[in-house]
Structures are given as structure tokens and as C-alpha cells.
Amino acid sequence: DGTLMIYLRTSTDCHYVTYSYDAGETWSKPVPTAFHSTLTNPAFLRLEDGRILFFYNNSRPLPELDKHKVWPPLSNDEINGVWEDVFTNRDTNCVAVSSDEGKRWSGFRELYLNELRNTCDFRSSGSNSSGRDKSVHQFQAIELPYNKIMVHVGQHALVRKIIIFDVDWLYEKQRSENFQYGLGSVSTQVYLKSVSGGYRGFSGHCAWNRTNGAVLVPDPSGDHTEAILLKNTEDSRLYNNVQGLVWNFPSSAKGVVRIRVNVKGKGLRISLLDHWINPVDTTVSRYAQFTSIVTREQMCPAIWTEVQIHYDTLQKTALLYAGNLEAVKLEMQGVAPNGLCYLHLQTASDRGDNEGTLIKSFEFDMRSDAE
């Protein structure tokens, strides 16, 4: 009908939307959307058949530090918010699709994870000639023949990528992961205490160095496969000592997530969300739509116990099953108008868990309203 719509980059927790009904002469008052983002750039692509693709980050940064206590010290402009101190939500991005002019969205598939997300020289690697920002929140996309989309993400030479995907990928209803091909599909980074702040004439722009958190270890059965180990690492160089893992699945209002685990230490926090939260962010219990802690007392005698979460955001409830034990009912926090699309696993303790939890695999199945 000629209406113009813009999704705005903001410093809040979400994009804002504004409309123009007079070819851009005037715009409505911007209002919040349900699309999670902080200081990242969104992009739309109108397809030839009328559908709309929305590229954005769908992520939340780590909680703000007391900027007066940061060392080395920040500038006054960085303390007062004129410039940023650090970006911790720009290592992932996603794409959603709408068939009704943006009224409803589906997909929310993780498009690309920053390949530098675990590197201990994240701040200084590469040069400044191709951009100081080593993030993946910039998008340029075009439609190709045969239902394909080509999108360019990122700007720095070390991280930018050109990706081609099929639009049908956004309509898939299952996903699984067993780590036989590594950790490329999950976020596991932990942050090193680093220099904060913007560019000061040499490499480093609002970024912290990182290193590996969760790692692959031999399966206890000795079958030559591997499993992920999450445990506390008592290391004073780290931002904190928790470890975590974040994995994306197709968005759905109803679904089942299955995880094969062996909790050996102080417990595993399992959370389901509608957006990406850092693996080491301990505020996940506040922002997750569903969250619970599984303990070793709930494990089966066998090596692996299957934990299932059957969730329904329309009814605002979920049932958690661990092995053959009675289901635990979980109450939903907040809202999820676009359904859930992220599994977040994290050590339940921030220290002293040297045994940790082994994670063998996980899978997701979408459920329809009739199921």
C-alpha cells in the first residue's frame, strides 16, 4: 500500500520500528520491536515473490561493567556513553522470513558465527586497513535464481564472508548436532580480561580477547567419538569462570529439545530462549523464557542420560524430563512472539566444578498446534 517501514539500530536491547505513510516526508514515533539487538545494523531484502527477509543479530551483550573501575581506564567520552567500551554481541547473526509484510516471522536461523570468536588475539589480529570492527553485523544481500540468496556479512578482512543459502532452509523443522565435525555450529567463547574502549591509533576497537571454553574430549565409552566438556576453569585471566554453549534451532512456538548429557559435577543450567546470549553470561537465568538446573542425581546409571524439554510458548509452560524421572514443570518468563530458537547450556556453578558436564549431542523437533 506504499507504506515505508524502517527498523532502527538503537543502544537499547532491541530494534525500533517507524513507519511513513507519505513517501518518507514524515515518520511515526519509533516503538520497540521483538527483535533483540544492541548497536547492530539490520537489513531487509524484498524477494521477487513478495516475501521479506530480515537480517539482524538477535543477540544480547554481556552486562555493563562499572566504567569508572575499568582498567586500563576509559576516556570520559567512553565512560559517558559517547563512545562504546566493548561489543560482546556481534559474533552471531540470523535471518528470518515473512510472507505477510512483516506481521509474522519465521526461521530465525543462525546465518554465520564469527570464525575469530575464540581467538586470544581478537583485538590485535589483522590490520586496520579493512576496518577495525571484527564483527558480523553488517549485511548486503541479493536474490539469485533457483530460490537462492547471496549475502555478504562483516567488514574486516579476517571475518567477512559471502554466503549463499536456499530460502527453504528457513522453513526447516528439525536440527541436530553430535560434534562429529567439530564445534563450528556452537558458540563456546570465554572472555579474557582485556583492554576496553575504542580505537587509539593501533589495532583494537571495542573488543575483548577470548579463548576456548568448552572443548571436545574422548567419549567415556572409548568408542573413538567425542563429547563436549563444560567445567569451571579457575583462571584469574578470565572475565568469569563459568563455561557455556549456545546453539540455534529453527524458531517455533512449540517444540521438543533433546540433550544427551552426563552431569558429573555441580550441575548444568539448561535454558531455552528467543535470542543469543553469551555462553558465559550468568544473567541467562533472568532472560531465558525457560530455564532449569539438571544435577547428577537425575542421571541414569548408564553413561548418557537423555534430557528432554517439551515447550509451548502459547501455553507458557514446558515439561523437563531427565531419564525415567517424573517430569518437572517449568513456567515461562517473559514473552516470545516469534517462538524460541536457542539452546543455552552453562555450568550451574561459577567456581569449584572441576568435573563438569559431558554433552554428547542435541536435537530439536518442531511441533504443530495440533500436537
Language-model-derived ranges and their functions:
Residues A288-Q308:
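Short, aromatic/His-centered strand-loop micro-motif at the edge of beta-sheets
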Residues S221-T295:
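Secretory/extracellular carbohydrate-interaction modules
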Residues T3, R51, Q174, K254-R258, ...:
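Intrinsic-disorder/low-complexity, polar/charged segments enriched in Ser/Thr/Lys/Arg/Asp/Glu/Gln
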Residues A23, Y321-E326:
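Short strand-turn-strand beta-turns centered on an Asx-Gly dipeptide
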Residues V31, Q243-P250, V294-M299, M332-Q333, ...:
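Beta-strand-rich interaction surfaces with strong enrichment in secreted/lumenal proteins
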Residues I259, A302-A322:
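Short tryptophan-centered beta-strand motifs in secreted/extracellular beta-sheet-rich domains
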Residues A327-K360:
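Flexible glycan-contacting loops in extracellular carbohydrate-active proteins
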Residues D1-S185, L192-A214, E234-S236:
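Asp-box/BNR beta-propeller blade signature and adjacent active/binding-site loops
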